[in-house]
Amino acid sequence: MELTICDLTKEFGSFRAVDRVSFTMTNGVYGLLGVNGAGKTTLMRMLTTLIKPTDGEILWDGQDVFKMDGQYRKLLGYLPQDFGYYPDFSIYDYLMYIASIKGIRPAAAKERVKLLLKQVDLFRARHKKMKNLSGGMKRRAGIAQAMLNDPKILILDEPTAGLDPSERIRFRNLISELSGDRIVLLSTHIVSDIEYIANEILLMKDGCITISGTADEVVSSMPERVWTFSVPKAQIDAYLKAYKVANIKTIPGGAELRVLSTVRPNSAAVEVEATLEDVFLYYFGESAGNDDVAV
């Protein structure tokens, strides 16, 4: 079971949204990490065959997915960043409706919906209307619809967008439970979404995969070192201008800084272990905080 992406490219006029991307996925969780606008959504839309690439190919066990038509789509489960639903449908009715669209027989659909509602902890809320659900409940209903056909490939585009911290943790745990014997590709611009659950992390910037590997491999790829030290309030701006500052913690009379630098920033600086958050700052810089519309 292997999904292979070969030199995948997508252009919109003169703009290249995805630029010669290549990687291979087998069973496990893959985290596609990048700022909004990096090309993650465009890549996922090609992987789900919603749009065709300008160049390159996507192969499932050696077969071109665009030539497999319905066979490939039967293997897919997809949760887009914004998924549609009828607001007056209950959660149960919504899932049964999606099951019918996916060609699942009514008797089998009832059993599958019941199982998934319990798995995503929505069984007791199954009669609630979709329009009355919290953001977290909607995302859990979304993951349930993506899992209706027990897909071999589960693709999740910014699945924790708009969720509070507790719902993010709950969602991550759910993804881990559902990963099992399947490929899970999860895109996000939030490091904590994938830091502890992804078998492999793919950093995407300007339409390209800049680096990939396990979390430890990605962290060790960063050439800069990480330092912490305290400075008086009057010196904070100077360090902000001179270095990549990963974190500022206010303390009496000044601040404790976490700084990325190849050399020791000052004599008081202590080197500490780098994290994936530090790597994200290194590769994406100021754009790491950009929340523009995804591409």
Where are the regions that the model predicts?
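Catalytic Walker B motif of ABC-type/P-loop ATPase nucleotide-binding domains
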Residues: 154-158
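Walker A (P-loop) phosphate-binding loop of ABC-type ATPase nucleotide-binding domains
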Residues: 35-39
